[in-house]
């Protein structure tokens, strides 16, 4: 009997109270080639999670980043994994080697909001904190 094909994780966009999806809006503002590159990287994470460096890095506390190289630019998409879902929280184009604190703070704020809204007892026990396989 054949082994069933692996099922990909579902990708969801964080949605604000106003109904905006900041990562989707950020992606739409990028060039076609940049969207394709970032989309392919997210697709790889979706199908082979857990993934390690250089594609994905843990930022601690269940927050992860997809690291996409866009030629002269570098993109980061911050996300969490809950059960079988990848939730895209925030996207940036990096302008320096370090990620600005305000960008990380925003991603962590969205992480907290998402967990509070989706987990009735406000626990993040289902958030993947496990380091990816190397």
Residue ranges of predicted features:
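Basic, Lys/Arg-enriched alpha-helical interface segments
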Residues: 1-74, 83-86, 93-134
